[in-house]
Amino acid sequence: MEKVLVFGHKNPDTDTIASAIAYAELKKELGVHAEAVRLGEVNGETQFALDYFKVARPRLVTEVSKEAQHVILVDHNERQQSADDIDAVKVTEVIDHHRIANFETSDPVYYRAEPVGCTTTILNKMYKEHGVAIKPEIAGLMLSAIVSDSLLFKSPTCTEQDVIAARELATIAGVDANVYGLDMLKAGADLSKKTIDELIALDAKEFSMGPFKVEIAQANTVDTAEVLLRQAELETRIEALIAEKDLNLYMLLVTDILTNNSVALVLGPEASLVERAFGLEATNHLLYLEGVVSRKKQVVPVLTNTAAAVE
């Protein structure tokens, strides 16, 4: 039987890893030879979840076309966020909760996207639809993804469906969602040992916005000041990254998981897009964004609309 690879976006977060594992597990239960793989390194938060529920991290793959002819995408659809050789394979399925952009196929594809806060919320439904019981360790990872994407149910992306799914998954996993969730978020928020390269790559995603090429990374922390102490080093490396990738704008969104506010470090020839989008003026390349915690719902849409107006 031909193998199918299941993977999420580059610079994987907890939802990407958990969704790949959970969906590959479901496909195997349904008789498909599926393997969850990853396109980048696992972050501290995700590793905490993997260790807690005793699940091995997926295998790292740099060229998916050397491994399989057919792939399934989870937690993303935009080609620039996917495998470098994504055009050399056939995408057969997509399970996602983001905007649909820069995505097309030559053949019909099973595409399931829902306006919920996390991909594993959708997968929880799919397990039920197929009558497959979720293993406790898989449920734990799926819960971890919801906690991560919703910042423990505080993000504006969080829906009632996410909360209900989290409660169900916590029961299966045998944990208290709030107690476990806070421990996991704190583990991921320790940025003290991160290198500059690791910081600017944290959950980094590339977007096409109007005529512009934009990259947005997000770092969750309990102390934004600690990160900003390294601003000079960050800016030097970001400027090099902008030149290397020919970016019009780079944003590092540093989010305080305790106050639910963010500080955005913005650089690039189109950095003023962020100022116009939020109606704020940057000071020393920094913008203070009160109440902003979600890149998907509070940053990408307003930036996309502002960029579109430039055309």
Curated annotation (Swiss-Prot):
Any GO molecular function: inorganic diphosphate phosphatase activity
The gene coding this protein: ppaC
UniProt name for this protein: Probable manganese-dependent inorganic pyrophosphatase
EC number: 3.6.1.1
The record's free-text note on cofactor binding: Binds 2 manganese ions per subunit.
Source species of the chain: Exiguobacterium sibiricum (strain DSM 17290 / CCUG 55495 / CIP 109462 / JCM 13490 / 255-15)
PANTHER family on file: BIFUNCTIONAL OLIGORIBONUCLEASE AND PAP PHOSPHATASE NRNA (PTHR47618:SF1)
Alphabetized SUPFAM superfamilies for the sequence: DHH phosphoesterases
GO cellular component, one term: cytoplasm
Cofactor: Mn(2+)
